[in-house]
Amino acid sequence: MSNGIKRYISVMQLTLINKKHMHYAPHIAMLVTLLLIGQQLAKLSWRMILPAYSPAIEMNDATEI
């Protein structure tokens, strides 16, 4: 690119570049979907393991001591 030489990229070259990237699009979409599903499952499992408020847990803790 030195000496004032300009390099033009043809439409065909842009199409080939886009095809290379589009090859990975389904994989990227699947990865994002799995990450979102995993995040939601993690939230759900923590809610089941540690409920926000449960008076029964407090009563059981007092009797075990």
UniProtKB/Swiss-Prot annotation:
Q: What is this protein called?
A: Protein MalX
Q: This protein's superkingdom? A: Bacteria
Q: Which keywords fit this entry according to its UniProt record?
A: Carbohydrate metabolism
